[in-house]
Amino acid sequence: MDVTDADVAEVGEDIDAVLDALSATVIADRELLETVLLGVLARGHILLEDIPGTGKTLIARSVARTLGLSFSRVQFTPDLLPADVTGTHVYNEGAGEFEFSPGPVFANVVLADEINRAPPKTQAALLETMEERQVTADGETHDLPEPFFVLATQNPVEMAGTFELPEAQVDRFLVKTAIGYPDGAGETELLRRRAGRDRQSPTAEEVLSAAAVRALQGVPESVRVEEDLLEYLVTLSRATRERSECDVGVSPRGTQRFFEATRVRAVLSGREYVTPEDVKRVARPVLAHRLVLTPDAAVEGVDKRSVIDDVLDEVPVPTV
């Protein structure tokens, strides 16, 4: 199926309605909210690195509510076990047999809060479900609901009590980004909204349904990407592998995720084709976290995002 202007226009109306509903609930940059929706439509997952208290839980809960999806939150701690996330078999006395009791990962939107406070084995259990979209327990396989989207948060690695995520696991996230502090006007609006209600947390309006979200996820699959832009994507990824600051550049899997993100970005921009501007807008959040700096570059404080910026400046942009 080819994507038509009408398809994109209809999707654009749905996306605008979702963003408006989120903006009425969450004090956050619209670009950030679009990035979260990009993850949902691309069937990817998002890693937010931020300090506590910046609204990560509210954003995740509001996204689930607005999209008509189920939501669960897992607080990662040093004593959290893999079964606490995925579920386990418990004995049913009435039936006289063991039955699988699903864990909190069985939801459409899962907030994995402070994922780097849990030990590596528990981190791996979640990341495996992200990749496979299913849970295997005692030889039985249980499919996760569709759509399935993980929004994981982590504290900056310099904070105490954290276990840094291995590079191979970070690579499984479509996007890594941050919320950051709101500006002065935003923080004032936060207090104004709090003063106007008797509950601590606001509730977002439901705009779509799970079935509608699944339909939206299919639209980017037919967005056109010209041959010159395919070569541009590959050239950008390969250029990261040749940078002197990097021990490891973007993997082939990362290049595929890059491609998928550009198509969703085109849909969010109301187009049925990808442009170089789409590529540039998603390059930082999709590629930077996939780089592994050399020890010297890490000591010098090289910013991975600046490496991506340099690559974008150096690689010729195709004319399409």
Regions found by a protein language model. Give the residues of each.
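Pre-Walker A (pre-P-loop) alpha-helix and adjacent loop at the N terminus of AAA/AAA+ ATPase modules
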Residues: V8-I46, I51
